[in-house]
Amino acid sequence: MKVILLRDVPKIGKKGEIKEVSDGYARNYLIPRGFAKEYTEGLERAIKHEKEIEKRKKEREREESEKILKELKKRTHVVKVKAGEGGKIFGAVTAATVAEEISKTTGLKLDKRWFKLDKPIKELGEYSLEVSLPGGVKDTIKIRVEREE
């Protein structure tokens, strides 16, 4: 019996593939558990259409991420914080703080999860920050932590 896999099935195939399996295996295991559906040309067209839509969505997401990254890399971003003598910051600069400050200056909608900090920044100075945007776009940007006047 020909089936179209709705999920990845170990030792059988990946989602969307058309496979020939025994009738009993299809009727008693794959179809009742929602792993596959019986093959029809209409179902195959629907799955191909779904894959095409998903591919376009990922491409759009990647393009959008590349635009955002290009905008972020244009300059060194400044984060102003309250600091004491010797450049020690009151509190710490976290990924959320960085995302918020850059959003204010650039007008971009940024998510704190896109910025990777090994540990919170506790001193004034310049830092390189890894940015990991949706669509697999990664790079580093520069930020400068300055004393708030």
Curated annotation (Swiss-Prot):
- Function comment: Binds to the 23S rRNA.
- Quote the PANTHER family the UniProt record gives: 50S RIBOSOMAL PROTEIN L9
What GO annotations for molecular function exist for this entry?
Answer: rRNA binding; structural constituent of ribosome
Pfam families, per the entry: Ribosomal_L9_C (PF03948), Ribosomal_L9_N (PF01281)
SUPFAM superfamilies in the record: L9 N-domain-like, Ribosomal protein L9 C-domain
Name the chain's protein: Large ribosomal subunit protein bL9
Question: Would you say which domain of life the source belongs to?
Answer: Bacteria
Query: What does the similarity note say?
Result: Belongs to the bacterial ribosomal protein bL9 family.
Q: Which InterPro entries match?
A: Ribosomal_bL9, Ribosomal_bL9/RNase_H1_N, Ribosomal_bL9_bac/chp, Ribosomal_bL9_C, Ribosomal_bL9_C_sf, Ribosomal_bL9_N, Ribosomal_bL9_N_sf
Q: Which UniProt keywords apply?
A: Ribonucleoprotein, Ribosomal protein, RNA-binding, rRNA-binding
